[in-house]
Amino acid sequence: MPPPTFLLGLLLLLLLAAAAPAPASATPERDAYALSRLKASLVPSATNSTSAPLSDWDPAATPPAHCAFTGVTCDAATSRVVAINLTAVPLHGGALPPEVALLDALASLTVANCYLRGRLPPALASMPALRHLNLSNNNLSGPFPPPPPAAYFPALEIVDVYNNNLSGPLPPLGAPHARSLRYLHLGGNYFNGSIPDTFGDLAALEYLGLNGNALSGRVPPSLSRLSRLREMYVGYYNQYSGGVPREFGALQSLVRLDMSSCTLTGPIPPELARLSRLDTLFLALNQLTGEIPPELGALTSLRSLDLSINDLAGEIPASFAALTNLKLLNLFRNHLRGEIPAFLGDFPFLEVLQVWDNNLTGPLPPALGRNGRLKTLDVTSNHLTGTIPPDLCAGRNLQLLVLMDNGFFGSIPESLGDCKTLTRVRLGKNFLTGPVPAGLFDLPQANMLELTDNMLTGELPDVIAGDKIGMLMLGNNRIGGRIPAAIGNLPALQTLSLESNNFSGPLPPEIGRLRNLTRLNASGNALTGGIPRELMGCASLGAVDLSRNGLTGEIPDTVTSLKILCTLNVSRNRLSGELPAAMANMTSLTTLDVSYNQLSGPVPMQGQFLVFNESSFVGNPGLCSACPPSSGGARSPFSLRRWDSKKLLVWLVVLLTLLVLAVLGARKAHEAWREAARRRSGAWKMTAFQKLDFSADDVVECLKEDNIIGKGGAGIVYHGVTRGGAELAIKRLVGRGCGDHDRGFTAEVTTLGRIRHRNIVRLLGFVSNREANLLLYEYMPNGSLGEMLHGGKGGHLGWEARARVAAEAARGLCYLHHDCAPRIIHRDVKSNNILLDSAFEAHVADFGLAKFLGGGGATSECMSAIAGSYGYIAPEYAYTLRVDEKSDVYSFGVVLLELITGRRPVGSFGDGVDIVHWVRKVTADAAAAEEPVLLVADRRLAPEPVPLLADLYRVAMACVEEASTARPTMREVVHMLSTSAAAQPDVPHALCKVVD
């Protein structure tokens, strides 16, 4: 037994040790100091006026007072900080200071949605106790912390840095680092390079999110070693080589696999059938080939399967009969053949079936919809036949029904008229017969009813209603009777298509109540009576076709009040009287056809009448271009546009001179052509739209690989510097050659070359031969708005600059829509088509896809082969396949949201969510916030000017309204944006004009 004196001495030493200060690295005082440095580096939100955030974080506080700080949790025994959660604190910027690593007992650090900027402190990587790190939805940049000499994240279990601006290679996690990691979300950043093989060593990993980066290389098969992995998201904006690793069949715990939109090739590996727990498989938007493996029928837990937009062939496997838990099946835009299996109609949970744009045949499953859950059915553009199943809306949940462009026959089920949840009905281009169910004209949620190109009969009901219906299309059927007055009860109607039917009686005057109507086509019927004067109430009309009817009376002078009317066709009626003289002042009217009527009097020889073809007036014996007073009005059928003898003589001399010159020129041209043909297959010819100090050869010299600055679907763009020092942007169009065979293209480009506007990229000219067209644009040294926002330079474009860019781009689009003659729809408005000059002034670019309104019989809605870019396309295009000015407005609204949020329009918001839906959801979920826009504003920038951002936000949300009729015009957008002082240009706005 030790002596008592020894015990007393030992006890004294223990007491002294307890009383002595702990090492500096392990004291509550040091924790308090680290918290004070963290507070000093954070920026409070300007919207919180009642109390400053973190006001209770008193730098002078002594332990354990720091344990009561907002968002701080301490160990009760030691007063050491073990958790920090500032997500609910209204912060608006700042950075993580390196002193945060002094919190060596910290197990959980959550600072999400706080607008953090700057780089991640390297010392984070060596924090010994850190298990939970959540820095998602900030503006952090730079690389992920590299491995320190000591252990790398030794205790880490959860990492979430989703939606930041981190770049560089992915962190080298895995053996021997971070072996305890369970959750890893690095998505929505700018990481590049390949996925490290070492990720396969993260044996505890359950969640892997790498989506929305810029990764490349092959998806490593080593990931198949992650035996506990439940969710894997590796697609969207990543561009891998190769296909889906067949080794992934070993991921026995996997529940969700999303590899959409990441350039995968090759077949779908049948080994995926071993993933028995899988409930979601998304492989859409890739280049996968081959047939759908029948082995996938073993995935009996599957609830969502999306293989759309690939190059898959073959039939829908019969083995899919076992997939009875499916809620969503998307197979559209492939090359599938065979029938839609009948067993799909028996699936009890099926909500979405989309197989459009394939080569499918046979009938629809007769039991489809009986489960009561079906919401979306789209089988467009196949070769399906049979009748429409009667129970599609048995559960009153059906919203989207699109069966167009098939071979369906029989009648439209009456049950569809009782389906009040329907928003879109498209049954066109089939062989449907019988009357249209009356209920289809009274669907409260419907925004479109399209039944064109069938053999429908009967009459329209007296009750027609619907506050949301924007398109009513019944053309090319056999519907008869009168057009009911109730047609005027559709306030949102934009398109009314009744052509080629058997309608009789007058055009109801109530049609004048349709303020938003842009297109009216009632041609090819048996209408009688006059053109109603009330038509002037349709102030938005762009195209009217009432041809091939039995209309009588005069053309009402009220038609001249339709200020944006582009096309008017009233040919082949029995109209009489004179043409309203004021029609000469309708500058928007580019197409007029009054042929084969009983009109009389003079054709005005001024204004718009100078651009109309003579064929527009034929068949009216009483019309003439100059009626002599002594003639008493009697005219020859051939008196129209009669020239007096002096004018005729002048023109004959001119024509004869031109003919002589043409013969001489042709002889010289033939000799020159023969000489050129010996030198090369096709000489380059330059057409200039202004004085240029360079030649076609100078331009061609610039077509070098090193000069490429952009590639897209329309062509390749080169940065050219001619020998004279002129800088150009040269766009070489894909698949276009020029010559006599392509005069339409030449005429279109020539018209574009006449456009002069401060905020439109000027087309200087074009160079062509028989193999290629080169468009020559003024060079914009600061690139595109898209590059500025998403290419790592976003922080360099401040809020005021963004507001000015928005206003300037809006003015350019406004000019195209409202001041050009003919008016122009851009059709591909996006941030990459808004270019910035040396002063960062915005210029709208790329009219390779633009179509003219009113030209050549076009209407205000043009059929589109290419209707814009993914993420920018207006929702109505999905069911109209047409674009108009409001489509451009929607796309511009998406650009505004890019300016506000700093985010790309798609790819970082989750499955099937774009920027519009994300902004709506985030701002709706936080209705109590002072300004909802602050919840989505770009966090890479300093605190926002709230009034300016609020204005931009309101304009953006107006532009992306679901119903196109609710969107403003670009002229209205310009007016709304001009109310912000920051949106005003530094110099006066240049005059807009088209030069001859």
Swiss-Prot record:
Residues 703-978 form the Protein kinase domain. Its EC number is 2.7.11.1. Its main location: membrane. It is a single-pass membrane protein. One of its GO terms (cellular component) is membrane. Disruption phenotype: Fasciation. Flattened and wider ears with irregular rows of seeds. Thicker rachis of tassels and increased floral organ numbers. Reduced vegetative growth. Highly expressed in the apex of the vegetative seedlings. Lower expression in young leaves, ears and tassels, embryos and roots. Not expressed in the shoot meristem itself. Detected in the three outermost layers of the inflorescence meristem, and on its flanks at positions of prospective spikelet pair meristems. Not confined to meristematic cells but also detected in primordia of glumes, lemmas and stamens. It comes from the Eukaryota. Keywords: ATP-binding, Developmental protein, Differentiation, Kinase, Leucine-rich repeat, Membrane, Nucleotide-binding, Receptor, Repeat, Serine/threonine-protein kinase, Signal, Transferase, Transmembrane, Transmembrane helix. Pfam families: LRR_1, LRR_8, LRRNT_2, PK_Tyr_Ser-Thr. The keyword NAD does not apply. One of its GO terms (biological process) is cell differentiation. LRR repeats lie at residues 78-103, 104-127, 128-151, 153-178, 180-201, 202-226, 251-275, 276-299, 300-323, 325-349, 351-371, 372-395, 397-419, 420-443, 445-466, 467-490, 491-514, 516-538, 539-562, 563-586, 587-611. The keyword Cell cycle does not apply. Residues 1-26 form the signal peptide. One of its GO terms (molecular function) is receptor serine/threonine kinase binding. It is found in: Membrane. The chain crosses the membrane at residues 646-666. InterPro entries: Kinase-like_dom_sf, Leu-rich_rpt, Leu-rich_rpt_typical-subtyp, LRR_dom_sf, LRR_N_plant-typ, Plant_RL_S/T_kinase, Prot_kinase_dom, Ser-Thr/Tyr_kinase_cat_dom. ATP binds at residues 709-717, 731. Belongs to the protein kinase superfamily. Ser/Thr protein kinase family. PANTHER family: LEUCINE RICH REPEAT FAMILY PROTEIN, EXPRESSED, LEUCINE-RICH REPEAT RECEPTOR-LIKE SERINE_THREONINE-PROTEIN KINASE BAM2. Receptor-like kinase protein that regulates meristem size during inflorescence and flower development. Promotes vegetative meristem growth and restricts inflorescence and floral meristem growth. Based on additive and synergistic phenotypes of double mutants, it is probable that unlike CLV1 and CLV2 in A.thaliana, TD1 and FAE2 do not function exclusively in a single pathway. However, KN-1 and TD1 do function in a linear pathway to maintain vegetative meristem homeostasis, but they may interact with different partners during development. This is Leucine-rich repeat receptor-like kinase protein THICK TASSEL DWARF1. It comes from Zea mays.
